[in-house]
């Protein structure tokens, strides 16, 4: 098997690096045979501890540039490791159909002997693929994709802890930003609905920009235990810029914050114990009725998906509409997927599952211990944009019945930060949504309390006060 995706190589050998911005991976390849394992990397990047780990586990470290010639040797059955593992059955037969569960059109089992080379056609670079004979290639989705997506108990615990610390950083950021918007711009603030004080808005000498405030958010995250950097470049967007789904501000051209406009921030971090991703949309002035109703529709879809119960074997594609239906009722929608997979101190986007309106041949059913985001939105060109995002863990759930003996699944939220109440039209929420929102906010107070000081906790208590149905 030839492994080329950097996150799969990192996961396979349990190594991390810093060769790629925002992704803790190292430029490397891997080749795994029935009795050998090879790691192709710049050897100067490896610490003595990593070298010892590789040696103890029978992994042969080779120079990064050797992978090309070694693939040629692999194709002719001449690639041999000095630390080959003994005791394997010669020429074993492997049931690929059951082993990979790729979801491809060909679902029948394929038997092969160990001179076939497993290559993921959706990931392998042509430079290596071209060195192989077509009749010796098994073109299947990588067998590492699914086990990497199925988080083990240590990874799940790490993700939960990382999201708690990250949630505390987001709350600290909102507390700081709320104060700054009031002091510098005369904004009514996070809680009050009123027009900004124009006179005070004009008097301020210091300005807040999309870049300067996102830098401050990074400062709060950097103060947290195990922080190693951002997991992607922060989307910090105000007003019409928030309508650009993948907007990335530049210091020279970014907008200044405006208390009379929506502010959307989509951000995340890399911690040693987990990767985070969160989006919140806020307003520090008086939101329009249209902004409030749009945000409420997005929130209703977010809650609906997060509360879904579904049978084993269901792909995320089948759940996507749950997040869109509240928007569809108004004739609104959004042009991106609703949920992406997330790594464990790895890529913030990874495979092989997703929640999207568009089905994918490589998509696999949602399974217990997978991590996925829940992030519906709405974007109105030249006006505003809204997105709300939490990370979810797939878990088993108890249902009154069990049709088909399939077993049923649900989601567990692991992201903790308040939803702005003044952007919510409570009159269109059903009692179940109000109950969920109040329970979620109560958990925010309980879970984040140990990480906040007195003033920050007072702010959070106010931000999470129960909503009356």
Predicted regions and their residues:
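Active-site neighborhoods and metal-handling regions in enzymes and metal-associated proteins
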Residues: 1-469
């Amino acid at each position: 098997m030839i492994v080329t995706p950097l996150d799969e190589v990192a996961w396979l050998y349990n190594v991390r690096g810093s060769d790629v911005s925002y992704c803790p991976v190292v430029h490397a390849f891997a080749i795994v045979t029935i009795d050998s394992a090879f790691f192709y990397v710049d050897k100067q990047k490896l610490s003595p501890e990593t070298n010892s780990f590789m040696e103890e586990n029978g992994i042969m470290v080779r120079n990064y540039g050797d992978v090309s010639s070694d693939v040629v040797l692999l194709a002719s059955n001449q690639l041999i490791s000095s630390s080959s593992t003994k005791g394997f059955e010669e020429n074993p037969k492997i049931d690929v159909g059951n082993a990979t569960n790729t979801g491809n059109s060909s679902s029948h089992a394929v038997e092969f002997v160990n001179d076939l080379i497993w290559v993921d056609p959706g990931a392998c670079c042509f430079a290596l693929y071209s060195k192989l004979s077509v009749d010796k290639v098994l073109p299947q989705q990588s067998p590492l994709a699914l086990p990497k997506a199925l988080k083990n108990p240590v990874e799940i615990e790490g993700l939960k802890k990382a999201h708690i610390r990250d949630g505390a950083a987001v709350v600290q950021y909102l507390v700081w930003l709320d104060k700054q918007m009031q002091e510098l711009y005369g904004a009514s603030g996070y809680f009050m609905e009123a027009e900004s004080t124009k006179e005070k808005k004009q008097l301020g000498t210091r300005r807040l920009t999309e870049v300067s405030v996102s830098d401050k958010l990074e400062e709060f995250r950097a103060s947290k235990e195990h922080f190693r950097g951002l997991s992607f470049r922060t989307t910090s967007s105000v007003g019409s810029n928030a309508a650009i789904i993948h907007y990335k501000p530049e210091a020279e051209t970014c907008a200044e914050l405006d208390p009379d406009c929506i502010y959307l921030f989509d951000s995340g971090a890399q911690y040693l114990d987990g990767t985070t991703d969160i989006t919140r949309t806020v307003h520090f002035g008086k939101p329009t009725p249209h902004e409030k109703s749009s945000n409420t529709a997005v929130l209703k879809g977010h809650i609906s998906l997060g509360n879904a119960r579904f049978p084993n074997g269901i792909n995320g594609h089948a759940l996507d509409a749950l997040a869109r239906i509240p928007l569809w009722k108004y004739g609104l929608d959004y042009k991106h997927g609703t949920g992406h997979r997330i790594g464990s101190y790895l890529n913030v986007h990874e495979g092989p599952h997703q929640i999207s309106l568009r089905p994918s041949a490589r998509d696999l059913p949602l399974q217990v211990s997978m991590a996925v985001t829940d992030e519906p939105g709405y974007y109105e060109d030249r006006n505003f944009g809204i997105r709300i995002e939490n990370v979810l863990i797939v878990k088993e759930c108890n249902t009154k019945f069990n049709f088909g003996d399939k077993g049923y699944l649900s989601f567990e939220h692991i992201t903790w930060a308040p939803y702005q109440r003044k952007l919510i039209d409570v009159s269109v929420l059903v009692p179940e949504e109000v109950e969920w929102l109040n329970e979620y906010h109560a958990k925010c107070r309980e879970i984040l309390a140990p990480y906040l000081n007195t003033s920050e906790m007072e702010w959070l208590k106010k931000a999470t006060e129960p909503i009356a149905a």
